[in-house]
């Protein structure tokens, strides 16, 4: 029941945060490594603006918000953070900073920017499903509105389909906006 309420609230907030995506983007080139587990590949964009939007070095920068990934790990079924899941999860801890006067919370900010993929199907894109909240300390703060220039911590988990294939995190400028970049996380 709580999961359904969270998803419904998130969907509503996603429609609000979709306004975060200003379709003008800066030019991004190159490839950087974020840490020993991850590499970042920025995409080339054709549009230019004064605002630099990107996803590299574990950080997504958009016009209205910034999301910094601080930790990742695989949590097995039954372990703390995945007590009720049916599959292992890839858990991500992050900080969301609101750079605007818009109503943004950490959960909808994340969902508007990121999707996770495990490329283990030769015929279709395998987008991972969101799992339960992997860290109970964020139960009360995950949907709180972040003040302008304020930063709130949160976590998210994706249900893994296997424990071999790396997870590709893809960032976009809002829900259906241009791709900002992608980062590969090894889960072994």
Provide a role label for each language-model segment.
Residues 53-56, 75-80, 137-142, 153-154:
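Short structured motifs
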Residues 67, 90-92, 154-156:
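Hydrophobic residues positioned within well-ordered beta-strands of beta-sheet architectures
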């Amino acid at each position: 029941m709580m999961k359904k309420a969270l998803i419904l609230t998130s969907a509503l907030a996603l429609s609000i945060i979709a306004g975060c995506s200003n379709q003008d983007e800066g030019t991004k080139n190159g490839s950087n490594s974020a840490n020993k587990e991850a590499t970042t590949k920025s995409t080339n964009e054709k549009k230019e603006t004064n605002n630099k939007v990107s996803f590299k070095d574990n950080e997504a920068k958009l016009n209205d918000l910034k999301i910094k990934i601080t930790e990742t790990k695989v949590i097995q079924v039954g372990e703390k953070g995945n007590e009720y899941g049916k599959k292992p999860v890839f858990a991500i801890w992050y900080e969301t900073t609101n750079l605007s006067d818009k109503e943004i919370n950490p959960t909808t900010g994340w969902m508007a920017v990121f999707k996770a993929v495990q490329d283990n199907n030769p015929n279709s894109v395998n987008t991972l499903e969101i799992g339960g909240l992997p860290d109970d300390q964020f139960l009360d703060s995950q949907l709180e509105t972040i003040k302008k220039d304020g930063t709130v911590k949160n976590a998210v988990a994706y249900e893994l389909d296997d424990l071999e294939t790396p997870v590709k995190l893809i960032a976009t400028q809002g829900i259906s906006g241009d791709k900002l970049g992608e980062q590969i996380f090894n889960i072994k």
